[in-house]
Amino acid sequence: MTARLTIRGVRLIDGIADEARANVDVTVEDGRIAAIGAASEVPPPDGTTIIDGAGQTLLPGLIDCHSHYPIDTTVDDGFESFRHDPDTLIALRAAGAARRALESGVTTSRSAGSPGAFDYVLRDAITAGFVQGPRILAAGPAMTITGGHGWPFGREADSVVDFVRGVRANVRDGAEVIKAVASEAAMLSGWDQGAGGAEMTEDELRAVVDEAARLHRRVLAHAQGGEAVRRAARAGVASVEHAFLASEADLEVLKASGATLVPTLSVTDVWRTIEGLTPVSRSRQDYIEPLHRRSCETAIRMGIPIATGTDCGVRGVTSDMVAREVRLIHEHGAPAMTAIRGATSIAARTLGLEEEIGTVETGKRADLLLVDGDPLSDLRRLERVRVVVKGGAVVHRVAAA
């Protein structure tokens, strides 16, 4: 039997137009968007499930371009949890984070690296319907230099040949994207005020990008300091993650490359007020946060494409914070509609999935989010989720109060 769904009378933010459209019906059939228009133009077929969208806004499902679902968010360095937590607990934690993300409106998530097979197992379990969560683009272990950021749970390499071999191994194991660690992690590693230093060489980064492209994969690069941002951008990565300490000159190189910036603003935003940080962590936060703000504001002013990525797995940063990330992008200078596109059409283009998701258009995969009110007047309304549709199926619904 053909599965049909019509969401009636909504305000539509389609991820393309500069303005929302009022009083629109969107019909879904067999997992795809079949029709969009006024009610008189789109009569629903017999047997259609109807959702009344009056007073609500329909958007494309949200996209998280930087997630770590298996990591413990309750400790300063969640990577340490992999040293002592049993695999069963890690897997259950990942499943819980995935469900939390889905219920907040996230329908696609790009992993930014996890140890072993956790990414692949979670992705496959969601695809099989064993657990609920967003569609996951799995990265597997991040590519890093020996002793570099994330080394205990990454794939270490020390030459162009080693990095090429690592990309091939990750793809063999099931990776759909490749994570390259181009710099230190200023918030986590031992550091001074020169934190965020470059780790992978530009030749190594270029080798990763070239081999990934040969295998039809894209590369995201953890790059916090300016030199790492420049190296990653020149190497041809699809996106630069964080850029906490990047200057305008560094960002000029990023802009020229055409790569997207995924600033992960929730990290320093959450840490501004979180309790229980160690004195060292508080010192890192106090130093990095204003520089991070300046970097993102500069990137927005320069017109660099910005996409949402929570970096969930960092202490206090949870998988339901994509809507928060949209709001933070707006607060750093982007118009509200542009910030929403950062979680929809810009994010989809960053992942290379713009033909499938990221906009509400006929023929696209029916990943949809219905929220109360008008988020363009208050982006906090993105957190007032009413219905989440993934692949044409209603996967989460909140009854009206």
Indicate residue ranges for each PLM-predicted region:
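Histidine-rich, glycine-flanked metal-binding segment
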Residues: T2-L5, L12-L59, E80-S81
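Metal-associated gating/positioning segment near the N- to mid-region
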Residues: Q56-F130, H149, D203, A235
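Active-site gating loops and adjacent loop-to-helix segments of metal-dependent hydrolytic enzymes
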Residues: H68-I90, R99, Q132, G140, ...
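Histidine/acidic-residue-rich catalytic or RNA/ligand-binding cores of hydrolases
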Residues: T73-D76, D119, L188-G190, V229-A235, ...
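Divalent metal-dependent hydrolysis catalytic cores, especially in the metallo-beta-lactamase
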Residues: R93-D119, Q132-T144, A175-S189, R218, ...
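Metal-dependent enolase-superfamily TIM-barrel catalytic cores that perform enediolate-based chemistry
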Residues: R155-A235, S239
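His/Asp/Glu-enriched, well-ordered alpha-helical/loop segment
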Residues: R214, E289-V371
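C-terminal cap of metal-dependent C-N hydrolases
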Residues: A343, R349, T362-A401
